[in-house]
Design a protein with these regions (language model features):
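Internal transmembrane alpha-helical bundles of multi-pass membrane proteins
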Residues: 194-386
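Aromatic-rich juxtamembrane segments at the membrane interface
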Residues: 79-201
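Membrane-targeting and insertion segments and their boundary/processing signals
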Residues: 69, 103, 169, 173-181, ...
Length: 386
């Protein structure tokens, strides 16, 4: 990038209001060019929505190499003009149009677009998602990959297993179905574009499949670290991606629970305790970046299970043109509020928390500390609330 002023054509990813440290609300625009994504501050007169194309001038003097490597940074801008809307050309844009056509409520349409296509969400919906604590369900990640894989496997098994049993009993249908599922996931990854959490989940799935074929132990922290390093080597900007950090941390805590605690309980108990463990263990990391805390966030413990049914069902409904069936329920749900507050985590506590997390690899007693940090966070909230 050349220093000084530069004229750009960019697409609006999201537009939302944010309260500044001086108490004033500002209009934040997240814009995407062919080479990078950046934030800028708009004016009250700007009327930009997600998907709009705009022409603007920016000042890039303060963009550091680290910021540019991260591919997401801030640049002041001026002379912002909305360009005439062009017909959707890409497959992704056409799918977005199909989703929006099924919903009168643009917020709900935006929610489904984020669920299925990994598009960004605006400020109001972002606040609703934070209030419920379901950001990990909205952002496409390993959870979605698991649901997609399970549904694909169920359909393939239902249709093709009898054929394999009669004509190809010597072949492993599980192996063949897994290859087909990976091809489906590759196409999905191409369609939705680069999403760090989905990339991590996909690479781990491939690594896990390879290890199963070679009869190598899967539950291994070094496998996880290897996939993380490989991902960063391919895409250095992941070092500065919060979503990638959350994704890796969530899987790490799943590994910790399965490694230390799962053998002591039944399958049913583990399905409940694993959910609780990861929820509390992740709390400090989430609060450090998104300090909103509310008792309503406990509902995610139940929503995690319901999502496994809702996600494929809502996809099928959209496929047949009935995507608006849950709109009224979702609108009321997103609007519902309980008392909330901002609980700010200091950098020292955050670094201590991460150091303890790494120690979990070698020392079992430390595996109890991250969820205890999370429990303490809610206790502090209750004390302040009372």
């Amino acid at each position: 990038m050349d220093n000084g002023e530069q004229e750009l054509t960019a697409r609006v990813i999201s537009s939302y209001q944010k309260m500044g440290s001086d108490g004033k609300k500002r209009q934040i625009l997240k814009l995407q060019t062919d080479d990078f994504t950046f934030y800028t501050i708009g004016s009250k007169s700007d009327d930009f929505r997600a998907g709009d194309s705009i022409f603007l001038s920016v000042i890039n003097l303060d963009v550091s190499f680290k910021d540019y490597l991260a591919s997401t940074f801030y640049m002041p801008s001026f002379s912002r003009e909305k360009l005439p809307q062009k017909p959707a050309h890409s497959f992704n844009q056409k799918l977005q149009s199909l989703i929006y056509a099924q919903h009168e409520n643009s917020k709900i349409a935006q929610l489904y677009s984020a669920l299925f296509l990994g598009t960004n969400i605006d400020g109001e919906l972002r606040d609703d998602v934070s209030n419920w604590g379901v950001a990990h369900l909205i952002a496409i990640s390993g959870y979605h990959l698991g649901v997609i894989s399970a549904v694909c496997f169920f359909i393939l098994r239902l249709v093709f297993k009898p054929i394999y049993a009669r004509y190809m009993p010597y072949r492993s249908y599980i192996f063949d179905f897994t290859i087909v599922i990976f091809l489906v996931l590759c196409f999905y990854f191409y369609m939705i574009g680069f999403i760090a959490s989905f990339l991590r989940a996909f690479l781990m799935s491939v690594a896990g499949f390879y290890m199963i074929c070679k009869k190598i132990k899967i539950l291994n922290f070094y496998t996880l670290f290897g996939v993380i390093l490989f991902s960063v080597a391919l895409f250095p900007q992941l070092l500065f991606n919060v979503g990638f950090y959350f994704s890796c941390l969530g899987v790490f805590y799943i590994y910790v629970y399965l490694f230390y605690f799962a053998p002591k309980f039944s399958v049913l108990a583990n399905s409940l305790l694993l959910n609780l463990y990861v929820f509390f263990a992740m709390e400090v990391a989430v609060l450090y970046f998104f300090p909103l805390i509310s008792l309503l966030q406990f509902s995610v413990l139940a929503i995690n299970y319901l999502f496994g049914v809702f996600y494929p069902l809502s996809f099928l409904l959209h496929l047949f043109g009935y995507g608006s069936i849950f709109d009224e329920i979702l609108s009321k749900m997103l609007a519902f509020r309980l008392s909330s507050n901002n609980l700010h985590i200091s950098t020292f506590v955050f670094l201590l928390y991460n150091a303890i997390t790494l120690l979990c690899v070698k020392f079992k007693p430390t595996a109890l500390l991250p969820p205890l940090f999370g429990v303490a966070s809610f206790l502090l909230f209750l004390l302040n609330f009372s």
